[in-house]
Each structure stands twice: as structure tokens, then as C-alpha cells.
Amino acid sequence: MTTSESPDAYTESFGAHTIVKPAGPPRVGQPSWNPQRASSMPVNRYRPFAEEVEPIRLRNRTWPDRVIDRAPLWCAVDLRDGNQALIDPMSPARKRRMFDLLVRMGYKEIEVGFPSASQTDFDFVREIIEQGAIPDDVTIQVLTQCRPELIERTFQACSGAPRAIVHFYNSTSILQRRVVFRANRAEVQAIATDGARKCVEQAAKYPGTQWRFEYSPESYTGTELEYAKQVCDAVGEVIAPTPERPIIFNLPATVEMTTPNVYADSIEWMSRNLANRESVILSLHPHNDRGTAVAAAELGFAAGADRIEGCLFGNGERTGNVCLVTLGLNLFSRGVDPQIDFSNIDEIRRTVEYCNQLPVHERHPYGGDLVYTAFSGSHQDAINKGLDAMKLDADAADCDVDDMLWQVPYLPIDPRDVGRTYEAVIRVNSQSGKGGVAYIMKTDHGLSLPRRLQIEFSQVIQKIAEGTAGEGGEVSPKEMWDAFAEEYLAPVRPLERIRQHVDAADDDGGTTSITATVKINGVETEISGSGNGPLAAFVHALADVGFDVAVLDYYEHAMSAGDDAQAAAYVEASVTIASPAQPGEAGRHASDPVTIASPAQPGEAGRHASDPVTSKTVWGVGIAPSITTASLRAVVSAVNRAAR
């Protein structure tokens, strides 16, 4: 037995640590309704953010009241920050494919590499410059540390580019000052300002390029705010930006250390207090260590930032950078243009997966395989009703559904707006109900099941789902159709209709006669009857051979558009079968024609002189090129299901 097959072996594979149920005392003041207990986790090794860095208390904060109504300036860093985090960094071909995708999507600032640290990155920067691959409205960005020789190499890589952003950085956090640089505040600030002077010096040597500068106090979230401002202001004095040629100050959550509201407070404080703010583009670069990079980016943007750096689908060091797809489509879902084209999310995802050689998770917002899929019965029912309501509203407004305001429960956006279809919106497993079954039968198979039939058939599917490996597995649309056909369309015992001849009434109030050839338990016989329509006449004919059918409800519809469309008919009937049923002997009733009311009501339609003593109420379904044949097949289906 393999580890995957043995829970014990799987548990043992984790080594010495054993999960121990928390059994310590409750915390002081813990309410009686909370039964949780103290764990044995070594929480004493960690401390609150306010103790590790500093408390951030912003008075009169304004960001909680702001509504995001515009897109930030985006910068995609997939080719640098994303690439450096890959198990196998991108080849030149994969880099080029990612770059071309980002350009097509509409990103205007793209960080293309760290050319002073990697020959591959250097060569790629030269390639896209020399091949003229950079559109006129796109600015490439390159990263460098503040060391002079690395800055020189960076400018060499960008020589000949029409426009370029040189992004220089050094870490300013309390922890890195102490354990990495072993330097004081003034010494760390000098690293930044010396780097800025070197950048200005190098830019003068390459006048053919329009240079811009970005500075990041790396590990900003672990840096005191006053000190972060001090360093940025000092760098700004060296660069001397103007409103027309602003500097980018990028404030990265290099490591996410606290809740997004604290990050937002810090961004608003910096936005208020940075010198020469009108000449500064305030940029965010959130990582996802605590799983809240998207929230941090959105709140930080509301707090005064102008620009956001991130990666498609959140690739990046450790838990990744903020996801540009999620940020952009969050805006889109609230009616704000992200100024990026996400209209073919699957092409974007496939390209990213190819370039990164990493899969996008099935649950990743907007792009995962399952994000527009509902398994829950109540969710499926609500989605089904929402889509139907959209269609009805569009018909009433005499417009296309695609022009209607999107309002469908559980789906924040229309999957079709990002290139998905509705095929996978509802999938059925043991958690599903009638809504999901009805949706798939309608969208995949063209059958609009009446509500009570939905309930009946969903019970069939429930049994199949619960029996899938005993674990509540999924039932595919094909498996669902096979089950439906076996349950409603396939049975031919005890009754099978062979053919019929109908003499229709000349007027609406007249009598219709039918002569039909049927098989009863394999024996062919001819039956005849009359009524106020073909269905009533057929019911009357069946009564003469032992099948007492009272039609309780009836539905019909075309399964598609066009002259060659199949018709579907659904009959809910109370059926009593005489035993044994022999032609002309069992179940005979008065020879008066049978009348079926329209609409048929329980107990009224198809009733004969003597009420049945015992009966089964069942649904029958018929599908045929003509609605008459479909309705007769539905009656036969009901009889055969009642005989089970």
C-alpha cells in the first residue's frame, strides 16, 4: 500500500511533530459560549506588529470612506519578481511570450528583468530593444541594487530603449539593518542616496533614452514610517523630480506583516507627509504572506497610492505577489474599467502556466477551473433562476441579454465576459439539488423539466452521486443523460407503442379518434379510443387493455429552434395497472369518450367511471419529431414506470 492509500502512512510522513488537541486553559475573559482551549503552539516566539516595528495610529484617516472608481497605473513584474521565484526561471522564448501577452493585455509599464544580476535577463532586455518589440506607449522597467557597478550594467542593458524606468532599491527595515547590513539609519540612507546619484550620473551618459526613476525602501512594512519618509525624501532631493517627470516611490509589503488596514494607514500617512508629493507617483507592491495582498492593494490604493505592481495570478516569492488578474476583475465586477483586457481569461491562464511552468489553482479568483462552478443545490437553483430572470428581463426590454445589467446570484461577473461559457457553471454531485439537475438537462440536453419532475429526477441523480466510489462523486452531463434515458425513455415493458393513426376532430369541440398498435408484455395488439384530443383518445384506448391512466399535469416544448426541432412532452399521471393486463379483458371501463381538461387538473383529466382502488403517481417523458407522438410516448413512459 502506498502512502497516498494509507492515512497512517500519510500522517507518519510528517515526521516528529504530532497534532495535539488544544487542552490548555481558555484565555482570560473568553466567553462561555466559546469552547476553544489554549494550544501548545509556541506563540511566545512571536510578537505583535506594534512591538516588532511600531504602532501606527493615523488620526482622521480618510481611506475607509473612499470608493475606488478608477484603475491605478499598473506595472506587471512577472518577468522579474515573478521569474526570480520560479523553480525553473523562464527561457528567452517563454520570457518573450509573457512580454507579448502583457503588451496585448494593455500593461504600459512592464518590469522586464534584473539585467545586472543575470546574463539571461541582460540578453532579454537587449533582445526586445534591438528587435523593436517595445511599443511606443509601453515603458520597460529594470531592477537594480544600489551598488555602482550594478547600476552601470543596468544602464548598459537599457541603452537604445526609447523609454525606461530604472528601479533601484535597498532594504530599510529594522531587522535587515540589524542582521543583514549591520548598519545604522544614516548608513542605510546613504546607500539609497548614493544609488540615486549614480543613477542620475548614468542617465546623463545615455541621452537618447527618456529615463525615469523608481526607488523602493525594500521591507517597507518592517520600517518605521518616519524613517521611510526620511529616506524617500532624501532620494527625491537627489533625483529632483517634477510634476511632469515624477519619481516613483514604491512602498512594498516585501513581507506581509500585519492586517491590510495597517498597511493602508501607513500609505495614507506617507501620501500626506512625503515632500514634493505632486512630483511623486506613490506605488504599492504587496506580497501575500498573510493571504491579504489583494485587500492590502485595494485599501492602499484607496489610501492615496497611484500605482500597483503585481503579477498575473499572483506568482512571486514565497506566497506570491498581489494578483493583477484579481485586482483588475474586482474593479470590473463593480463597473470600473481596469483598462486591461481580460476578455479571454483561459488564454491568459494557459500562457502564464506555460511561461511559469506552474499551474493556476482551480479556485483562483476569476481564472481557476472551478470559480464559476456551483455544486451546492441551493446555489445551483439560485443561479438557474437568475439566468432565467435575465432572459425574461431582456425579452421584456427587447434587447440582448449581453446588454443587461448582470444580476445572477453567486456569480459576481458573467463568465462569458472573460471568455468562459456556461457549460461548467453548474456541475452535479451529492451536494446538488434539483436546480443543478434542471440546469444541466436544459443547457446540455434541451429539456426544460417541470418542477415536480426536477424533484423526482434529482433523487435519481442523488443516488448515483452518492454511489460514486462511495464518496459523493460528480455526475457528468453524459452520465446524467444516460440515467434520464434509462429512467424515462428506454423501458418498453409492459407497454410499447409501435405506431398510431389519429383522426382529428373537425372543430375544437369535436372528438378525436385514435387507433394504435402497441405491444403488451411483448404481444402486439391493436387498440382504439376517442377523446377531446390525441392524448385523451390514447388514454381511453389504454383503459380497454388494463391501463387506467389519469393525466394530472402535462407540459410540452420544442427542444431547439428550427423546423426540424424535436419535441418533448411530460406527463404526470396517476396509473393503475390491472393484473394481468390482457387485451380487451382487464381494466375495461365505459365506452364513452374520455375528455382531458385543459389545463389538466389532478383528479379531473382522464378519469373513468370507476375510480382506481390503488394507483401510482409518476412522471413520463416522450421525445419525438412531432408533439403528438411525443405526448403518446410520455404516457407510455408513465405506464412503464408505474409498473416497476
From Swiss-Prot:
Principal location class: cytoplasm
GO aspect biological process, one term: L-leucine biosynthetic process
Domain Pyruvate carboxyltransferase: 72-346
Keyword GTP-binding: no
Family matches, as InterPro entries: 2-isopropylmalate_synth_dimer, AIPM/Hcit_synth_CS, Aldolase_TIM, IPM_Synthase, LeuA-like_post-cat, LeuA_allosteric_dom_sf, LeuA_N_DRE-TIM, PYR_CT
Cofactor(s) the protein needs: Mg(2+)
GO CC term, one of those recorded: plasma membrane
Region of interest: Subdomain II: 434-490
VNTR repeats: 575-593, 594-612
Pathway recorded for this protein: Amino-acid biosynthesis; L-leucine biosynthesis; L-leucine from 3-methyl-2-oxobutanoate: step 1/4
Region described as Linker: 425-433
Residue ranges of the region described as Regulatory domain: 491-644
Region (Subdomain I): 369-424
Binding locations of L-leucine: 532, 536, 563, 565, 625, 627
pH dependence: Optimum pH is 8.5.
E.C. number: 2.3.3.13
Purpose: Catalyzes the condensation of the acetyl group of acetyl-CoA with 3-methyl-2-oxobutanoate (alpha-ketoisovalerate) to form 3-carboxy-3-hydroxy-4-methylpentanoate (2-isopropylmalate). Active on small alpha-keto acids such as 3-methyl-2-oxobutanoate, pyruvate, alpha-ketovalerate, and alpha-ketobutyrate; only uses acetyl-CoA. Complements an E.coli deletion.
Name under which the protein is recorded: 2-isopropylmalate synthase
